Amino acid sequence: MLCDVYRSSKKADTYLYLPHGNEFTDVPDVLLGQFGRAEKVLTINLANREQLARLTVEKLQQHLHNDGFYLQLPPKREELQVNVNK
């Protein structure tokens, strides 16, 4: 399965994952308004991976299948501090 990844023009470190070729039809208008202009950054072949930076490919595929998209938000400040201290 191919997946397109878009970066938000309004929110730093915020990404929207969509099935390849999807025209944002499953993304709520409110979310698109807050997301801003979507800049495509890459296309990922999920068949070649098990893990992404913040979630498993299995979880991502579940979101894409059930919701039609996945919104990746920046990690919370506490999560960053824990990762730095490891």
Curated annotation (Swiss-Prot):
It comes from the Bacteria. SUPFAM superfamilies: YcgL-like. Pfam families: YcgL. Residues 1-85 form the YcgL domain. InterPro entries: YcgL-like_sf, YcgL_dom. PROSITE patterns: YCGL. This is YcgL domain-containing protein IL1825. The lineage of its organism: Bacteria, Pseudomonadati, Pseudomonadota, Gammaproteobacteria, Alteromonadales.
